[in-house]
Amino acid sequence: MANVQKIGKAVYKGPSVVKEIIYGITLGFAVGGLWKMHHWNNQRRTKEFYDLLEKGEISVVVEDE
């Protein structure tokens, strides 16, 4: 039974600095990529809006009836 207790007991050695840095960098790249895709989407929508406005397909002026 003494061997079972030694195997089952987890020893906390403290935080791993290298592991924490790798986690931080990975999380930063993932969130940064999502943020960049969000901005690319906004840029595309703005460009499409101004292209349609220039072609005359849409208007920002309300038509009177």
Curated annotation (Swiss-Prot):
Keyword entries, A-Z: Membrane, Mitochondrion, Mitochondrion inner membrane, Transmembrane, Transmembrane helix
Subcellular location, record wording: Mitochondrion inner membrane
Q: Mark the transmembrane ranges.
A: 20-37
Any one Gene Ontology cellular component term annotated for this protein: mitochondrial inner membrane
Key word Flavoprotein present in the record? no
Question: Where in this chain does the entry annotate a coiled-coil region?
Answer: none
Q: Which InterPro entries match?
A: COX5C
Protein purpose: This protein is one of the nuclear-coded polypeptide chains of cytochrome c oxidase, the terminal oxidase in mitochondrial electron transport.
By sequence similarity, the record places it as follows: Belongs to the cytochrome c oxidase subunit 5C family.
Q: Which named protein is this?
A: Putative cytochrome c oxidase subunit 5C-4
This protein's species is: Arabidopsis thaliana
